[in-house]
UniProtKB/Swiss-Prot annotation:
This is Probable CCR4-Not complex 3'-5'-exoribonuclease subunit Ccr4. LRR repeats lie at residues 23-44, 46-67, 69-90, 92-113, 115-134. Gene3D superfamilies: Endonuclease/exonuclease/phosphatase (3.60.10.10), Ribonuclease Inhibitor (3.80.10.10). It comes from the Eukaryota. The gene is CCR4.
Amino acid sequence: MAEECLVSRKKFGGKAMEVRSEMWTGLDLCSQGIKNISKSLFDMRFIRTLNLANNEIEVIPREICNLRHLEVLNLSKNKIRSIPPEIGKIVSLRELNLSDNLISNIPMEMGTLYNLEVFEIANNPLIVPFNTLIRDKKLLQFCREHNTGYPPPNDRLWIECTGKNVFYGDTVSVGTFNILSNIYATRMTYAPSWVINSEFRREGVLQEIVLYNVDILCLQEIELYSFFDFYKEQLEMRCNYDSIIYPRGRVKSVPDKKNVDGCAIFWRRSKFRLIAQFPIDFHQKVIQDTRFNTNQELLDRYGKKDNIAIGALLERPNGQQVLVMNTHIFWDPDYPDIKLLQVLLLVEEIKRVSSRHPNACLLLQGDFNSLRSSSVYKSITTPVIDFADFGDTMQHLSNQQFGDGLGLNDAYSNQDLGFTNFTPGFKGVIDYIFYGGGISLASVLSPVEDEYTENVAGLPNMHFPSDHIFLGAKFAFPNKNISQNAFGRNSRQ
């Protein structure tokens, strides 16, 4: 249903109008003698252009940040004395005109307007250093570099989960973290340059890992050089970790292999030893599988997407085995069919390995780039494969013998997680910790509170080294004499 918004008759001085978003995308209220902006205006979240020039406006309401699709804003020739910090949340802005007002100060939050191409603020009594910075066209850069006035988030705590089985033994803690490849970080121009600096972020990532100090850790977007030159040694020394890494498929073709990122698994050597590892290159599986490699339309759509997964079969001192799978699924929301295909190939590999190790518990972690409403999520958390996201291009594949879904549990299914990935253009849950094989969820790491995200445009920032957050869970492992199966419930539960 189209949004309906009412322009206040009292505030704007004209006849009240009912307007619908499909009718227009801009609003011109220039030279209307307006003194106050009606709050109802900020319910028109569909508008892209707003002209309020040449009026008598003294205050810009902080609710202006609700206009998240606004691209052009003209407030020139008014009596405005200050800019609300909330304007920095309108990251879609491309043109902003605040000329001919009474503005003396600039909020540092303006630095997050990374799409801003035209910024006019002439004929304002700007104080030092803003008057000089605007002349040298360095004002927004200055704001971006000094945008540090927001408070830190609350400490994240372990939240206990009810129903721990009395027959269970000790607990094992696990975590997953997409640490943001340095190549991708440099594209996040809404963040200060010192925030996306590779050494600054590297230390921040290390601090988070050491802080939570889990027994099994899965990392995504970790470059080969970062792994071998830094994380492997540092985490061996600080957390007593052993580790393996598997890079993206492009490592076979690019000359600068050290910058290729991949997935890595770390485990505490005092609690586990490596029995076997299982690298998975989804692209290679597609081009080698007779179900797919004769379908040119499918091959063209898949292209050279080089997403991967890595598995590790770990064994505890008591002989109990754990199959840990870490994956990074394709990112583009326009390709839900490719995401589902990659996950179905992953599901097949998990079943193949699990059939050889039927008593192993299962942990599946990573960045799945998929919401809980997706076929990807449903195919992992239910016993039935959901083919809805295959669409027309790959619908014929739903008839192939993919078998059943995994029917795993989501460690955060009972938590209001809010987000695991937060950028100016997206905020949602796409990272997961799935588990099965008789282990029982004991606790999870608490979410980042929504109140914190209301003050920032996106991650990374000075408090978070990546655009993803660290997820953690603790599991109570069954005593070894209790029968279990990776895809079924414990016999005593």
